[in-house]
Regions:
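Surface-exposed extracellular loop regions of Gram-negative outer-membrane beta-barrel proteins
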Residues: 82-84, 118-133
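Outer-membrane beta-barrel and related beta-rich outer-membrane complex signature
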Residues: 125-129, 217, 261
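A short secondary-structure junction signal
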Residues: 125-128, 171, 179-184
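Flexible, surface-exposed loop regions and adjacent strand-edge segments
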Residues: 130-135, 264-266
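Beta-barrel outer-membrane channel/assembly domains of diderm bacteria
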Residues: 1-118, 139-177, 186-190, 195-199, ...
Length: 268
């Protein structure tokens, strides 16, 4: 065959070899792709370094549905913005690599489940935030830790439509290296969220328990045993008025229960 069905963008899966010019058992014709590239230049004043840096990131996101309701998502990414760490951009180098892969599937009319590797544990959350920006804290409307996105490795989650605009979700991440998943040696994170979405406003409460990891090695447990509990409150208002801005607000508090820390280490 001379045709490449990868980005055919058709509806549903291919069930008959006569329907298109590729084998019925090889690939779905419902795969789509999106491409994103960002360029940045700036500086971060750390008190000891305020030099200016530039960088970029690139994302290729592939989405496939096999029955019209499920979704297999693969994200390829590259970026060199490590000197601008406060930006919500890729920082792992110039080589294009698989950043995450996940599969999402509905269970009946009200439940949705997902699992994957490299994906965020908050994938099924409905955080009440309509602001979109480039920095980590502002882009998340202050929900920086409670909405789990630690890149530990294995991730899974479940969401439930409670009706009348209310929804609930749980998410988890766990280290997937030589220590095994959900063991005493692995770094684990789990959390939950309850949210409400109205016609032009919404609110959500998010909570998470994240085991502390070493500053230089994501997913490696800190030598000081403990975990950080985070709670975030978010809300937004998006009036249906021409030229009137939307408003998003958020507040998060964090408590580190490490044995050698005190309440003075609480942050918000």
């Amino acid at each position: 065959s001379l045709k490449n069905p990868l980005l055919a963008g058709g509806e549903g899966t291919n069930h008959s070899p006569s329907d298109s010019d590729f084998d019925a058992d090889t690939f779905s014709s419902s795969t789509s792709a999106s491409f994103t590239s960002n360029f940045a230049i700036g500086s971060i004043d750390t008190g000891s370094d305020s030099k200016s840096y530039s960088g970029y990131d690139y994302t290729l996101a592939l989405t496939t549905s096999y029955n019209g309701d499920d979704s297999l998502e693969v994200e390829l990414e590259a970026g060199n913005t490590s000197n601008l760490a406060e930006l919500d951009l890729h920082q792992d180098g110039d080589g294009l690599r698989v950043g995450s892969i996940s599969y999402t599937k509905p269970l009946g009319e009200r439940l949705v489940i997902f699992f994957g590797d490299g994906a965020a544990g908050n994938k099924l959350y409905s955080t009440a935030c309509v602001y979109s920006g480039v920095t980590n804290a502002l882009d998340d409307c202050g929900n920086l830790n409670a909405a789990i996105d630690k890149e530990f490795g294995t991730a899974a989650g479940l969401s439930a439509d409670l009706g009348n605009g209310f929804s609930a979700a749980i998410g988890l991440e766990t280290q997937n290296t030589g220590t095994g998943i959900f063991t005493n040696e692995s770094a684990d994170a789990f959390g939950a969220q309850i949210s409400y979405t109205g016609d032009n406003y919404g609110a959500s409460v998010t909570w998470a328990n994240i085991e502390n990891t070493g500053a230089q090695a994501a997913g490696v447990l800190d030598t000081d045993e403990g975990a950080t509990q985070s709670t975030a409150f978010n809300a937004y208002f998006a009036p249906d008025l021409n030229n009137f801005p939307s408003v998003s607000v958020g507040f998060e508090s964090n408590h580190d229960d490490s044995s050698d820390l005190t309440d003075a280490n609480d942050e918000s």
